[in-house]
Amino acid sequence: MAGASLGARFYRQIKRHPGIIPMIGLICLGMGSAALYLLRLALRSPDVCWDRKNNPEPWNRLSPNDQYKFLAVSTDYKKLKKDRPDF
């Protein structure tokens, strides 16, 4: 057991205790969902600036009908009018 690799020990534990398979599946699903949500926040959020030289204020380039929220229940972004100045 001391020389066994991590994968072999993991497989042995799953073989001995098959009840932990759903728990491992749910943990993997949760970790995958969290990683995808962080990726979405990093790529779609107007507050994140990856290139400070070419685009120092990315939130100024958003038009009023750009939906950047994850879920907008009562707002129809297609009908909004522009109410701010251009920079």
Curated annotation (Swiss-Prot):
PANTHER family: NADH DEHYDROGENASE [UBIQUINONE] 1 ALPHA SUBCOMPLEX SUBUNIT 4-LIKE 2 (PTHR14256:SF5), NADH-UBIQUINONE OXIDOREDUCTASE MLRQ SUBUNIT (PTHR14256). The lineage of its organism: Eukaryota, Metazoa, Chordata, Craniata, Vertebrata. Belongs to the complex I NDUFA4 subunit family. It comes from the Eukaryota. GO terms for cellular component: mitochondrion; respiratory chain complex IV. The gene is NDUFA4L2. This is NADH dehydrogenase [ubiquinone] 1 alpha subcomplex subunit 4-like 2.
